[in-house]
From Swiss-Prot:
Its cofactor is Fe(3+). Keywords: Cytoplasm, Electron transport, Formylation, Iron, Metal-binding, Transport. Rubredoxin is a small nonheme, iron protein lacking acid-labile sulfide. Its single Fe, chelated to 4 Cys, functions as an electron acceptor and may also stabilize the conformation of the molecule. The lineage of its organism: Bacteria, Pseudomonadati, Thermodesulfobacteriota, Desulfovibrionia, Desulfovibrionales. GO terms for molecular function: electron transfer activity; iron ion binding. Pfam families: Rubredoxin. The gene is rd1. The modification N-formylmethionine is found at M1. The keyword Cytoplasm applies. It comes from Desulfovibrio desulfuricans (strain ATCC 27774 / DSM 6949 / MB). It is found in: Cytoplasm. This is Rubredoxin-1. Fe cation binds at C6, C9, C32, C35. Binds 1 Fe(3+) ion per subunit. GO terms for biological process: alkane catabolic process.
Length: 45
C-alpha cells in the first residue's frame, strides 16, 4: 500500500501500521499525529 509523508514535519503514514487503512480512506478530519496539519499537507512517499 502507498505510504504518505507529511510535507511539514516528515511524519510517514504507513497503512501497514494502521490496520491496513489506505490514506485516502482516512476521515476528512484526520490530521498528522505529530504536527496536527490536515491530510492535504501530505504527499505520496
Amino acid at each position: 500500500m502507498q505510504k504518505y509523508v507529511c510535507n511539514v514535519c516528515g511524519y510517514e503514514y504507513d497503512p501497514a501500521e494502521h490496520d491496513n487503512v489506505p490514506f485516502d480512506q482516512l476521515p476528512d478530519d484526520w490530521c498528522c499525529p505529530v504536527c496536527g496539519v490536515s491530510k492535504d499537507q501530505f504527499s505520496p512517499a
